[in-house]
Amino acid sequence: MKSGQSMRNTSGNEFGDDARVISFIGISAILTVILVCVWVLAPPADIGVAEGQLAPNIISEAYAGGTWSDFELYDNIDMTWSEGDEGDWIFLLFIDTDCPFCYDAGQKHSDYYNQFGSDVKFFTISTELSIPGHSSSKTEIVDFRDKNPNNGCKSDKANCADRPGTPHDWPYIDDLNRDIADDYDLPGTPFYLLLSPDGIVAWNSGQNEGEDPGAAIQSIMGASA
């Protein structure tokens, strides 16, 4: 009798184990189907630089004093942010160190930062336009930002130390290979974008010709407060 009971108990345990395995497989299959449906049915992110689109990610190196370090734009945004929530707005400034308009705008950029830098994250993307005489370098980017002596700014027509404005105390991002410029369909420099904390383009200077970026930031930030 004991032997028979042992056999029956063993068989019962085996059936129980089989049931648990089958149940686990079934649940896993259901979860897989759900995840696939969510992935297929979820609308893809509308990525671009027009107002209302999610700004393309930026992966490069940034200089904020000291040494260059890895940088990724999406590390600075909150995809879960919604209107009314607290969050960091982002101001992207596209320049070329050989661009005379960018050089002359140095004072305005300092003014924007002095006015909004405590509430808005500033990032300058330093690219190289495909124009004769435009040949920059990481050294020139650093000297443009920090106002170091370097006669290479403004297509070798000006010293970086004489750039209008103060040294810029925010990160400068390397785009000498023009990857970011291509992703952003850069129309020229200077070019500006204001992003809401979730990375959505709230203001595009190309869509608002003649509007001062500082006035735009003031208007949008005031409306979102």
Each model region followed by its residue ranges:
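N-terminal targeting signals for export/organelle localization
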Residues: 1-71, 225
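A short beta-strand-turn-helix
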Residues: 59-90, 114
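PAS/PAS-like sensory domain loop/N-cap motif
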Residues: 74-76, 99, 199
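Thiol/disulfide oxidoreductase modules built on the thioredoxin-like
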Residues: 87, 164-169, 174-221
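The canonical Cys-X-X-Cys-His
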Residues: 99-103, 192
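Structural microenvironment flanking redox-active thiols in thiol-disulfide oxidoreductases
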Residues: 103-163, 176-183
